[in-house]
Amino acid sequence: MNRCWALFLSLCCYLRLVSAEGDPIPEELYEMLSDHSIRSFDDLQRLLHGDPGEEDGAELDLNMTRSHSGGELESLARGRRSLGSLTIAEPAMIAECKTRTEVFEISRRLIDRTNANFLVWPPCVEVQRCSGCCNNRNVQCRPTQVQLRPVQVRKIEIVRKKPIFKKATVTLEDHLACKCETVAAARPVTRSPGGSQEQRAKTPQTRVTIRTVRVRRPPKGKHRKFKHTHDKTALKETLGA
């Protein structure tokens, strides 16, 4: 009888595990995350109607059960080591959408696109850019306020093995404010089989008509009797007659 109950319980656990592995993440969860500001794991657990202390309490009860059941100092020491490992690991915090200092490389194309035989100093500077992740996959961290900041750099040219220093101005873009904004999804373009024909019908077509002009030749034999007449005076008299 006990063996049958054990098989039944193991089968139930297996079916539950299989169903849990194949379930996709529901869309309601994405909507729930997008409507709240979640900065830590505790906030996420509160949003999902959970208690932050349940996980730590379960681990503590498990360790205490093992220590009392064994009754040995070694098991108690293992429980203390497991609790110590939990206190060392700090909770993960979300990288919220805000401005951060980033390194921007000043390329030579920003100064002179026609010439590449020079150096730029400094080669890189610091800028403020928006970065971070949002709670929903349909939104992205984007700047809402931008400021243009001109800076002066040195353009170093080598002419006849001598360096020539020139000044150049580069405009940098700093982000002052950020916000998680909705990303417009690209609509799929559906092409019907008759779409190309309709487009051709709507497009005005210019027809070029080429007309061929034929030159009529005089009928043969009309002036055949004057073919061998070389005297112009005799030809005029004959035509005048």
Curated annotation (Swiss-Prot):
GO terms for biological process: angiogenesis; cell chemotaxis; cellular response to growth factor stimulus; cellular response to mycophenolic acid; cellular response to platelet-derived growth factor stimulus; embryonic placenta development; gene expression; heart development. It is found in: Secreted. Keywords: Chromosomal rearrangement, Cleavage on pair of basic residues, Developmental protein, Disease variant, Disulfide bond, Glycoprotein, Growth factor, Mitogen, Pharmaceutical, Proto-oncogene, Secreted, Signal. Residues 21-81, 191-241 form a propeptide. Residues 216-230 have a biased composition (Basic residues). It holds the Pfam family PDGF. InterPro entries: Cystine-knot_cytokine (IPR029034), PD_growth_factor_CS (IPR023581), PDGF/VEGF_dom (IPR000072), PDGF_N (IPR006782). Residues 1-20 form the signal peptide. GO terms for molecular function: chemoattractant activity; collagen binding; growth factor activity; identical protein binding; platelet-derived growth factor binding; platelet-derived growth factor receptor binding; protein heterodimerization activity; protein homodimerization activity. Glycans are attached at residue 63. PROSITE patterns: PDGF_1, PDGF_2. Its main location: secreted. Expressed at high levels in the heart, brain (sustantia nigra), placenta and fetal kidney. Expressed at moderate levels in the brain (hippocampus), skeletal muscle, kidney and lung. Coiled coil: none annotated. The record marks 108, 111 as: Involved in receptor binding. GO terms for cellular component: basolateral plasma membrane; cell surface; collagen-containing extracellular matrix; cytoplasm; endoplasmic reticulum lumen; extracellular region; extracellular space; Golgi lumen. Residues 216-241 are annotated as: Disordered. Belongs to the PDGF/VEGF growth factor family. Growth factor that plays an essential role in the regulation of embryonic development, cell proliferation, cell migration, survival and chemotaxis. Potent mitogen for cells of mesenchymal origin. Required for normal proliferation and recruitment of pericytes and vascular smooth muscle cells in the central nervous system, skin, lung, heart and placenta. Required for normal blood vessel development, and for normal development of kidney glomeruli. Plays an important role in wound healing. Signaling is modulated by the formation of heterodimers with PDGFA. This is Platelet-derived growth factor subunit B. The gene is PDGFB.
